[in-house]
């Protein structure tokens, strides 16, 4: 909700501080004041050309997140937020395209190739959803996510 640095600052500059204020109000009401990494929501921007913002944090405060699956988690959450939005939206209010920044590449210091791998994996898993939930699948997904070069054991 603190949209005053990096890509967030550019978003606030473009849409105005009213958007940041509404994002913060949503976080206060829906997340008791702290939106966890790995969650996301869609909010109206008030701009007809760019009608929605998906708020999907990659960190609570600025810090290095290289070596984690945070980029995957934030991307996955953003995709799920769009999916949820589209399930209940009227046809003319559905989100049909999304622009993502290189999540975690700024102050998070995740290398661009790792960002791309984690975001691509989230997308591929989203468009090819699992058909069962079991330990084999969970272990496989974990191995997929941490096979990106962002993971440094």
Stretches found by the model and what they are:
Residues 1-153:
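Macrodomain-like recognition of ADP-ribose-binding/processing modules
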